[in-house]
Amino acid sequence: MRLCYLFLSFILFSIPVQAADYVAIQHAENQSLKLLSLSDSLDLALKANPDIAVAIREREAIEGVKVQAATRPNPFVSTSIQDTRSATRQIYFQLNQEIELGNKRSARIEAADAFYSKADAELATKQAEIHANVVLAFYELLVAQERVTLAKSSVEVAESALDAAAKRVKAGKSSPVEQTKSNVATATAKIELVQATTQLNNSRKRLSALWGDNAPSFEYAVGDVASIPEISSISALQTRIDNAPSVKLAKQEINARDAVTKIERSKATPNITLSAGVVNNQELGGLNQALLGLSIPIPVFDRNQGNVQEAVSRKFKAEDELIALKNKIQTNLLTQYERLSAARQASLSLQNDILPNAQSAFDAANRGFSLGKFNFLDVLDAQRTLYQAKSQYINALLEAHQSIAEIERALGEVVDHQITKP
């Protein structure tokens, strides 16, 4: 019996806490499994994400706006007849050309360039968002894989304990209550395995959906969830707020609104239309006479003042939005950095103190039970404590990776996921 519980102890303590170990074991069993790394996930998402494709199409559309902004007004031809009698008829032929004043064309070109830069910034912002989503989804998948592994091991331990309890009851060495408790523990472990498996399937789908694949083609994610990437100090991160993708986008929005304001102000200057043509005068024996003309609107009532006011207000609005955005990023950055620090500290405490103590308690419970000093409830309680400690450790690691992903969502790619910090 002592050997049986020592074997149970070995099973529980051999539960891996790193996704790399998990993948290595599975890969050794079947070399045909398809493995996915974080870099693979990022490459797939940045190349095939539908939202990024939308942003690229928008930038392509602005290229057409740039072409159109540089065009000049087309000339137009007009003709008219005065008097329908052939003897006194006068026929007018005119070529008219509108001349833009007030730097309208240069203002349009400047605005088109500004909106193209804005589209570029929107693309960069979307790429940063997708990058963060991939990092977040990938580490959630690694954690889901760890939870399945932990749940499977827990089921194995529970089933072995159930078998041992049944034998002790049959031999008259234990109360039937112990077998009932072991049955409950086994059923609970199986439920947790079903829940962990469901979470794993959902995590796989969430990750693959980021590159438009609703049916994941990979089998396992390769990575070390226990390695938390190294990140700069909070003061160093704060200096990068001005270069954050969303801040750059907000600045480009201000530039675009300023360019629109210039367009609206240029419209206050009316354009002129020059005309040149001939008049065929039948009264003078069909003589052709030169015809020159000039027309210009008189800006008495409409000076485009309403549109100018709107454009100026929208520019001020964009400036206020930039200030609000920076404040939001600053607050979020502080929150996520504190969250990261707490998660890192929790993971270290669990790894160095709580998990070893939980393991010692489980070993002691096993030894005591085999010597008749503890009852079976003590063994189950020690087993559950160890399982919860490992779950807390995995959750702390996930918290750390989630915080890093949110920091990258705010500031862009500021972390090298290959460089880790214990």
Model features per residue range: what roles?
Residues 20-22, 43-101, 213, 238-320, ...:
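A small-residue-enriched
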Residues 110-113, 176-185, 376-383:
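Short, charged, amphipathic alpha-helical segments
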Residues 5, 21, 126-243, 336-339, ...:
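Periplasmic alpha-helical coiled-coil/stalk elements that build and connect Gram-negative outer-membrane
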Residues 6, 20-25, 30, 392-422:
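Acidic, low-complexity, intrinsically disordered peripheral segments
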Residues 20-140, 148, 158, 173-179, ...:
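Short flexible linkers and secondary-structure junctions
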Residues 5-14:
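Bacterial N-terminal signal peptides
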Residues 15-19:
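Sec/Tat signal peptide C-region and signal peptidase I cleavage site
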Residues 54-69, 126, 130-151, 160-162, ...:
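Amphipathic alpha-helical coiled-coil segments
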